[in-house]
Amino acid sequence: MNFSIEQYSKFMTLLDMLLHNLQTLHMSLEDSIKWLGEVMAEIGPNHSQKSEDFHVFEVKEANAIIDYLKISLFQHYRLYEFLFYSTREEIVIGTEQTIEVVKPADYPFPAPLEEGISLDTYSTFIEPLPTPDMEQKVLDQEQGTQEALLESEMREEDPLGGFTIDDVKSALERVTDEVLISMQKEISEKLQVQEEAFNARIEKLKKA
């Protein structure tokens, strides 16, 4: 059906009234069909003042509307009743999000990237002048850094830096002598043990 704008408006009004009867007045399916029949019965050339709002439809158009309501609202009437009357649990689904806020463009933090400018311009016009406390803090940090560097350099010095060549030679000779004496003593003990073993064997052979 090709309805006019006014007919579409009246049709939507009729549909809204049917849903209102269902949701608010709790009309049953039989009552809704009866109410629709009473409204549509007044459509025609001899319409009464009661259905003045719907006299824009002809009988053929009214029959088309009834056929549409049969296969839509009335066919699924129980579903609409369940939709309007049944209580349902409300499931609230939420997510927690952590939003990191950009730190303020205050010393020593730089401005956000989209607001970035050249270092020369920042140093000349924007960078705040250091306060005495800040200067003292910077000096303390520099002094601490220098002391740490000196300590690390002292630790990395050559461990033999305080000895002369003669001292190193004498130390090596002393260590070598101690090692050689220990080896000679060990060899002498082993030879003595072997000599005693040979002498014992010779004595056994003589007695035999």
UniProtKB/Swiss-Prot annotation:
Q: Does the keyword Cell cycle apply?
A: no
* GO cellular component annotations of the record: centrosome; cytoplasm; sperm flagellum
Which InterPro entries does UniProt cross-reference here? Answer: CLAMP
Where is it localised? Cytoplasm; Cytoplasm, Cytoskeleton, Microtubule organizing center, Centrosome; Cell projection, Cilium, Flagellum
Record-level Gene Ontology MF annotations: calcium ion binding
Q: Keyword Metal-binding on this protein?
A: yes
What keywords is this UniProt entry annotated with?
Calcium, Cell projection, Cilium, Cytoplasm, Cytoskeleton, Flagellum, Metal-binding
Tissue expression: Testis-specific. Expressed in spermatocytes and round spermatids (at protein level).
**Pfam families from the xrefs?**
CLAMP
> Which processes are annotated in GO (biological process)?
sperm flagellum assembly
Q: What does this protein do?
A: Calcium-binding protein. May be involved in the control of sperm flagellar movement.
Q: What is this protein called?
A: Ciliary-associated calcium-binding coiled-coil protein 1
The scientific name of the source species is Mus musculus
Tell me the organism's taxonomic lineage: Eukaryota, Metazoa, Chordata, Craniata, Vertebrata
